[in-house]
């Protein structure tokens, strides 16, 4: 398997509706579902959920 198949680059978009995104990698074997992380959104100046975008 190629490196990019196991750990693809994914975009995490803010659920606050600001359009702010984080870019990260994820392991498909450990996390086959869409990722949801609670991170800081500087537009609203709060911690909000960021969901994986495909």
Swiss-Prot record:
A Pfam family found in this protein is Ribosomal_L33
* Species classification: Bacteria, Bacillati, Actinomycetota, Actinomycetes, Mycobacteriales
Q: Name one GO molecular function term.
A: structural constituent of ribosome
Keywords of this entry: Ribonucleoprotein, Ribosomal protein
Could you identify this protein by its name?
Large ribosomal subunit protein bL33A
The primary gene name is rpmG1
One biological process term from GO is: translation
Similarity-based family: Belongs to the bacterial ribosomal protein bL33 family.
- From what superkingdom does this record's organism come? Bacteria
Q: Which residues form the signal peptide?
A: none
User: GO CC annotations?
Assistant: cytosolic large ribosomal subunit
């Amino acid at each position: 398997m190629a490196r990019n198949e196991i750990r693809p680059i994914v975009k995490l978009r803010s659920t606050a509706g600001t359009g702010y995104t984080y870019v990260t990698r994820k392991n498909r074997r450990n996390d086959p579902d869409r990722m949801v992380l609670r991170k800081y959104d500087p537009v609203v100046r709060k911690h909000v959920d960021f969901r994986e975008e495909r």
